[in-house]
């Protein structure tokens, strides 16, 4: 069951091991890959912060993103502005940052940019919930 409260105005946030489990993150990756591909892009930058859950989330997210043959350009562990900067000067204007930001260490989340615009968690909520 998906906690619908993880989908927020400017991002996705929740308890890393409960709300952002592997299945949910993979579904988010699939939905984001579909949105990105609809814009004519076929690549996405991906960065992580230093939270302990970041690598697990990254692995599941990449699985979902690559299910539609999207190329993931892994920036590794970087500050969030590096992902935004890469989308301005790099090979694509799409990026995802896995970050818990200022939230407690048990939390994590995703900040997403497609075609230079922030993606609201609300925008993809129904698609993620309805994905089988």
How does the language model describe each region?
Residues 2, 9, 13-132:
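Gly/Ser-rich phosphate-binding catalytic loop and adjacent alpha/beta segment
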